[in-house]
Amino acid sequence: MSHPIRVGVGGWSFEPWDETFYPPGLSKSKQLEYASRKLTAVEVNATYYSSFKPDTFAKWRDATPDGFMFSLKAHRFSTVRKTREDMKKSIDLFLGQGITALKEKLGPINWQFPPTRKFEKEYFEMFLSQLPKEKDKLPLRHALEVRNPTCDDPAFLELLSKHDATVVYAEDDDFPKIRHSGADFAVARLMQSKSDQPNGYSKADIDRFARTATDWAKKQDVFVFFISGAKERNPAAAMALQAKLGITPATAAEAGGMAAGKKAAAKPAAKKAPKASTKTPARTSSSPKKKK
């Protein structure tokens, strides 16, 4: 896929999506395969809490079509270290677990900092200097997600440019909305979907996102993720944005076979994505209220 804009959601396993996104009867083991044929990227939140073996990353890679990409959230401990030595140890541990098994499907790495981390030039200079530009000969793209308003500072953007990194644009009223045009890629996390909107957002909002992404894509590769908010609506939001942008993901023609856990027929009929339910599913234990 050569389109400069990729659109996705956070993860692929979320119980309410069984009603609003996945076809009836689709096995859990086939959810990534299905999602990757309806969307063009996904943000992996599980790497924020746990480490995985190279075989797991390779399995994810093999389950998805050409052009699909994974954005990984770096482990939460890697952005709370205070000394150069501890930073390097945590960063190396995360990058060394086997993420390069994703190969060309490895997208931006999101280094998410806590809201308490204020902008201090020396601190961020030290952190950014520990981020390698490649791993196992695979280029790495680093995006810092900051949640303290003091980071909305030109000096912060200068540091990012110096180290070929960018800042995550987080659309949420609780966090600063910082835009950086100095990198060759951009990452946006849209976090305000509403349960009373079948597509999570109004048509006007989807149109606005499309205009912004199109403008950014004139000079950058763009990754847009619908995260948190009314999470049950996020796949519908992502597909609505893709439709507005004219993005056509890999076909899900084999979805019928996936739904039954069987091999697809030689020439299966293409299935349409299930329509977003207008009924809000009950919140489950897998539907966290905390913003990620």
Give the ranges of each region predicted by the language model.
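Residues lining hydrophobic/aromatic ligand-binding pockets adjacent to catalytic sites
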Residues: 1-292
